[in-house]
Structures are given as C-alpha cells and as structure tokens.
Amino acid sequence: MYIKSLQLINYRNYENLSIKLCPNVNVFIGDNAQGKTNVIEAIYYCGFAKSHRTNRDKELIEWNKDRAFIRLDVHKDRLDKIIDVNILKDGKKAISINSIKISKIGELIGTFNVVMFSPEDLKIVKESPGIRRRFIDMELSQLNKRYYHNLVQYNKVLHERNLVLKNKNINEEMLDIYDIQLAQYGENIIKTRLKYIEQLNKYSKEIHKEITSGKEEIEFKYISTVKDLDNIKDSMIKLLEQNRKKDIDKRATSIGPHRDDFNIYLNNIDAKIYGSQGQQRTSVLTIKFASLKIIKEITGEYPVLLLDDVLSELDFNRKRYVLTSIKNIQTVITCTGIEDLTSYLDENSKVFRVINGRIQC
C-alpha cells in the first residue's frame, strides 16, 4: 500500500498544494513552523478522520477560510482509492471514498492503514493508562471492523450507565440491563486486546533485541479490571454488581475495558517507573515497528509509516535500525536537515523542501 498523491486546499498554512509521492521514502525538509507536520497530519487524518494534534477540526482550516479540503490518492489491494475530506468551520466534516459519501467514520477506518511515530508518542510509556488504551484502540480499529463496532457500542452503553449513576433516584433495573450489555461488548473488546498483546510480544521480542544489540528484552502485559480472563462476560457482570454501590457513590463505572491498561517491561522492570528516557523512547520505537508487522500479517500489506521529527532524537544505532527497516515500506519523514539521511536515500527516494506553506521537490 502506498500514497500516490496528496492535495490540500486551505489546510493549515497550505492554500493550495498538490504533490505526488514515491512508493518508497519521502523526506520533507524545512525549518520549524514551516508546515512539515501539517502534511503528516493531513495524511493521518485520512486514516482516522481525526488529527493527532487537536480535537478541534476548525483549527485545521486556514485563517479566514470557511473550509479545508484533503484528497489522498492511495494504492491498496491492487486498487486505487481516492479519499476526499471536507472540513467545515462548524465542526462538521464530509468524507467520501471513490466519490461515494460515507455516513459513518467506521466506513473510513481501515481503508487507509497508517502508523505514525512522533515525539508525543513517548506518552505511551510515560503517561496515563488512557494514552495506552487509545493507542491499542486506534491500532485495532483500523484492523478489525468488529472491534471498532464493539468499541463504539460499548462507549454508548457506558455513557448511558454513567448517566443513570448520576441520577438522584437510581434505576436498578436499568443498571442490570446495562451491566449485561457492557459485559457482552466488553468481552469482545478484552479478548481482541489480549490477542493484540500476544502479537505485540511476538514481534517486539526480536525487534527490541536487534535495536538494543541483545541487551534488553521487552514484554507487554495486559492489566484488566476483570480478573477472570477465562470467563470475561460472567466475571464482568458479577464485578459490576459487586461494585455498584461504589459506582453510585463515585457516579462512574469502575469495571470494564475502559479502565484497563497494559504494562511495558524491560528485563522484567517496569519501563514507565524505572526506564530512562532513552529506554522509553526505544520501547515506543519497538512498539511502532511491531505494529507495522502486525498490520502486514493481517492485511497482507505494510501500512504507510509517518515519522514526524523523530530521527533527531534517536542515537546512531536506533536511527540506523529505522532507516534500514523501511526499504519495503512507504515512509514519510519530516526533519530539519538531510545530513543523516543521505547515505540511506537512493534514486527511488524523493526529497521535498518546505518553506512557509510551499513545497519544492
């Protein structure tokens, strides 16, 4: 899979941009605040219908304009797919695939597979469980339509249950109904996550050993509020009932995959608590390259890899690993200088220079 071309109109600082990408390595070079990350962001948006930088779509629209437009021409499964995105100032968006308008975001997710590595991804190791849940949910949603459906339905039921918990007069019968529904959707979510963690461990083992020259072993462990993972549905219903009084007091649901997490261990030591920043960054690098392999295993094609200003933060060995591992993967790289890349680029690579919302090839 690879991107053939990208068009932007009134997107961030791009008034009108149309570029063709090569199926191999594409490097966007420029000083800070020139628009390099805006290109990455627009590509990412076509995969998930959301930015990785903001939840406010109107920020994507150029100043004093009414709308922004993205067109991504993608070659996937031996077919060309054109994704069109119109973003309006009122927060609405209109998306079409091959000129057919979609009615739900779920119809887009999985059409264009993408993995991104940016400096913010260090949060996957360092910060709250919500960051790690979001990572695993995004990865699984683009691979598994059923998972995305279960996640959407689970969150709807969770919202309704929490509304009941906030009422002065608690409707116990409604809570009974919501408990069963949560457990049904929650079981599917947890089972799929557990399988993903297995795959993550399978691929990460060799990747991390290679990056660290065999000095470290990495392992991921899923941490669930549901203790009996052999009987998730019944166990979850029971725990929701047992914790109902606490949930009523706190006005929030305490059991379920929305409270789960996964831990990252380096040589059996918790990377979040005891890992150095270098070790944490290497862990994220491992996760991202394992994600590439998982997507290849499931779909038969590598996704597009987006590397947003991360090479400058990697040491020589890690940088070399990245640049020697992307030969068969379309990669979009942003950076301020090309000096460290020249020996890894060839006649099949493409270099773009970004200057204040204008791109020269």
From Swiss-Prot:
PROSITE patterns: RECF_1, RECF_2. InterPro entries: DNA-binding_RecF, DNA-binding_RecF_CS, P-loop_NTPase, RecF/RecN/SMC_N, RecF_2. It comes from the Bacteria. ATP binds at residues 30-37. SUPFAM superfamilies: P-loop containing nucleoside triphosphate hydrolases (SSF52540). It is found in: Cytoplasm. Keywords: ATP-binding, Cytoplasm, DNA damage, DNA repair, DNA replication, DNA-binding, Nucleotide-binding, SOS response. One of its GO terms (cellular component) is cytoplasm. One of its GO terms (molecular function) is ATP binding. GO terms for biological process: DNA replication; DNA synthesis involved in DNA repair; double-strand break repair; SOS response. The RecF protein is involved in DNA metabolism; it is required for DNA replication and normal SOS inducibility. RecF binds preferentially to single-stranded, linear DNA. It also seems to bind ATP. This is DNA replication and repair protein RecF. It comes from Clostridium perfringens (strain 13 / Type A).
